[in-house]
Curated annotation (Swiss-Prot):
Location (main, coarse): cytoplasm
Principal EC category: lyase
Active site (UniProt): 54
Family as reported in the entry's similarity comment: Belongs to the thioester dehydratase family. FabZ subfamily.
Designated name of the protein: 3-hydroxyacyl-[acyl-carrier-protein] dehydratase FabZ
Pfam families: FabA
Organism: Colwellia psychrerythraea (strain 34H / ATCC BAA-681) (Vibrio psychroerythus)
NCBIfam families the UniProt entry points to: fabZ, PRK00006.1
GO BP, one annotated term: lipid A biosynthetic process
Localisation per UniProt entry: Cytoplasm
Function: Involved in unsaturated fatty acids biosynthesis. Catalyzes the dehydration of short chain beta-hydroxyacyl-ACPs and long chain saturated and unsaturated beta-hydroxyacyl-ACPs.
HAMAP family per the UniProt record, alphabetical: FabZ
Keyword Lipid biosynthesis appears in the UniProt entry: yes
Amino acid sequence: METVKKPIDLNEIKTLIPHRYPMLLVDKVIDHEPGKTLHAIKNVTINEPVFTGHFPELAIFPGVLILEALAQATGILGFKSTEGRGDNEMYLFASIDKAKFKKPVLPGDTMHLHVEFLKERRGMWKFYGEARVDGKVVCSADLMCARRPL
């Protein structure tokens, strides 16, 4: 039996997280299971503003922005796992542990962002995230987020 995918388009993403260009780093959600997992993508292009300085001779997508893309994916999963986003609230990136960068992400790459909900305790949500390019892990980390008013 084939499972039905649950995509989320860019318009809905923008109702769930407050980020906008150039800091909106999730292009679309391929699939998600509320309370469990989310698979999203970020298409990295040479037109990203960051590439004018990182680095002019060899454009490499910054690791901190890969982590930010994973954090945005956790916010989307968080809101899709609960009653949704209320007025003037968001998930704040609270901490990161065990971050590893294994390969550079270059213009033209499609990053597949995979996040998994691990647990919630006292309003803090813990996730495991991986960014993959061509099926290979380029970054992994444990991320903590907190749902808070703006």
